[in-house]
């Protein structure tokens, strides 16, 4: 057992009478009902290497937002409060989040809202396909909330989005960042077999020791199995996964996860610095130095990853097109 500190959240109380499962819960409301051990921690000062590019006045930032709203679409960029939103929207790129904006999980590192999801929007695949065509995107990332309420975890909705996007934009490469389909993995993979993406991504997020705190409802071995089983069914489709640092892990634990990834045939890797969305989320326990990120990158290539995007501001879908291109997949 490692002696590294465990990231914890501040305590918020919520009575059963206050809980409304149909309401989208964010921040304190979302994390209030998770039994997280509370350890007072001083908020760390951000180092100089943590820098975010803001949207500029002549960027496409507001144009992209208007197009998304007009088509009733959601991006994880907005819902998860991604620090790179200004840069990505400014370049006319976005990671689309399908199946609503209410997740059935309550991961306390994530800023996506929790609640009882709405019924699937049958028009969403068409709206998404038309938006991608309108934006003339060469590479898109499609992700989603967890939908534990659906028998297939939302796999058929992914297939509908992929197939309709390919009908209108046959030259567009499609990466999906999927949930874990826990409890329905074989059914989900059977469905995805009908129309697999160009890149299959599922994030491990953190080291196994921290799963109980950071990913309640998820299972480390299951996430590895998802990617390996998909790869066995689709050997020509690259697989990808991502990790955060700063939740209480050690460098050696990160390297161990990377080894597990390669042992499960994962091709591409992303590692970035965790930044707490609010005081009600898991706190940052450390800011990893650029030299350490460089070490992770060098070790990744030694292990045989085809591409490793590693750095403080790296996120799973940040510059995903460039990641795939550099890996030789796009």
From Swiss-Prot:
Domain of life: Bacteria
Family designation: Belongs to the radical SAM superfamily. Lipoyl synthase family.
Catalytic activity: [[Fe-S] cluster scaffold protein carrying a second [4Fe-4S](2+) cluster] + N(6)-octanoyl-L-lysyl-[protein] + 2 oxidized [2Fe-2S]-[ferredoxin] + 2 S-adenosyl-L-methionine + 4 H(+) = [[Fe-S] cluster scaffold protein] + N(6)-[(R)-dihydrolipoyl]-L-lysyl-[protein] + 4 Fe(3+) + 2 hydrogen sulfide + 2 5'-deoxyadenosine + 2 L-methionine + 2 reduced [2Fe-2S]-[ferredoxin]
Protein name: Lipoyl synthase
Binding positions for [4Fe-4S] cluster 1 per the UniProt entry: 77, 82, 88, 317
Entry's cofactor comment: Binds 2 [4Fe-4S] clusters per subunit. One cluster is coordinated with 3 cysteines and an exchangeable S-adenosyl-L-methionine.
Pfam families: LIAS_N, Radical_SAM
SMART domains in the record: Elp3 (SM00729)
Metabolic or biological pathway, per its Swiss-Prot or TrEMBL entry: Protein modification; protein lipoylation via endogenous pathway; protein N(6)-(lipoyl)lysine from octanoyl-[acyl-carrier-protein]: step 2/2
Biased composition (Basic and acidic residues): 20-31
Cofactor: [4Fe-4S] cluster
Gene responsible for this protein: lipA
Segments forming domain Radical SAM core: 88-306
Record: residues binding [4Fe-4S] cluster 2: 103, 107, 110
GO molecular function, one term: lipoate synthase activity
EC identifiers of the protein: 2.8.1.8
């Amino acid at each position: 057992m490692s002696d590294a500190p465990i990231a914890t959240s501040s305590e918020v109380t919520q009575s059963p009478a206050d809980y409304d499962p149909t309401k989208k819960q964010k921040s304190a409301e979302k994390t209030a009902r998770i039994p997280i051990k509370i350890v007072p921690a001083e908020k760390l000062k951000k180092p100089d290497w943590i820098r975010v590019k803001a949207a500029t006045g002549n960027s496409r930032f507001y144009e992209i937002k208007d197009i998304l709203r007009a088509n009733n679409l959601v991006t994880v960029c907005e819902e998860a409060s991604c620090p790179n939103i200004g840069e990505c929207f400014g370049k006319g790129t976005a990671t689309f989040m399908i199946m609503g904006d209410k997740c059935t999980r309550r991961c306390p590192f994530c800023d996506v809202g929790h609640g009882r999801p709405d019924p699937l929007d049958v028009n969403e695949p068409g709206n998404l396909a038309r938006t991608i065509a309108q934006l003339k995107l060469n590479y898109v990332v499609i992700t989603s909330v967890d939908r534990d309420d659906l028998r297939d975890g939302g796999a058929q909705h992914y297939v509908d989005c992929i197939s309709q996007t390919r009908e209108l934009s046959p030259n567009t490469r499609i990466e999906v960042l999927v949930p874990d389909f826990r409890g329905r993995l074989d059914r989900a993979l059977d469905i995805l077999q009908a129309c697999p993406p160009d890149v299959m991504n599922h994030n491990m997020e953190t080291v196994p020791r921290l799963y109980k705190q950071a990913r309640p409802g998820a299972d480390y071995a299951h996430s590895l199995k998802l990617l390996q089983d998909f790869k066995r069914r689709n050997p020509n489709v690259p697989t990808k996964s991502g990790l955060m640092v700063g939740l209480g892990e050690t460098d050696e634990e990160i390297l161990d996860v990377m080894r597990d990834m390669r042992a499960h045939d994962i091709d591409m890797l992303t590692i970035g610095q965790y930044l707490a969305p609010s005081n009600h989320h898991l706190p940052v326990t450390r800011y990893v130095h650029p030299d350490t990120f460089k070490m992770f990158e060098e070790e990744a290539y030694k292990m045989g990853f085809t591409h490793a995007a590693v750095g403080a501001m790296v996120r799973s879908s940040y510059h995903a097109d460039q990641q795939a291109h550099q890996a030789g997949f796009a």
